C-alpha cells in the first residue's frame, strides 16, 4: 500500500517509478528524523537520539539500493494476470512474508526500508509503543490506510480513479499490519530475550 503513492504519482506525471519511490522514501526519512528529535525533547528518558538519527539516515542508502533493484526487476517479473488462483496464492504468501519480515527487522532494530521505518518511528514516539509490540502492527494498518487514501485522492483528482489500487492493495493494507501484530504477540518476547536479554 505504501508504494501505491509513488506509483500513482509516477503514472500521473510520467516520472520513473523507482525514482519517485526514492523521493517518497527520503521524505519518510526526514519525517522520522523530525519525530525522533521531537520525542527526545518531550520524553527525557528517550536518551539515544544519535542512534535513532543514525538509523534513520542509513535508510537512505537502503532506499537507493532497493529502488535500483525495483528498476531492474520490475520488467522481469512474469505476469499472472489470467490466473486468479495463482494471484491469490502469491498475494497471501507475499502478505505473510512481508509482515513477518517487517516485524523481524523492526524488532531487531535492523535498518529497515523507510516504509517500515516511518511506522516504527510513529510507534516509538507515541503511546502505541507501550502495547507490547502490538502498536507497530496497528501503526502499520493506520499508515497503510493513509497511503491508500492519498493514492485514491491522487487518482480521483487527476481523472484516473483507481490508479494504483486493487484488491491486492486493499488486502495488503489490512493483512500486513495484522501479520506484524500476530507475529509480535507470539514471538516478540522470545526475540527480545535472545537478542537483547530482556522481555517487555
Where are these regions (language model features)?
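Core subunits and conserved enzymes of cellular information-processing
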Residues: 1-200
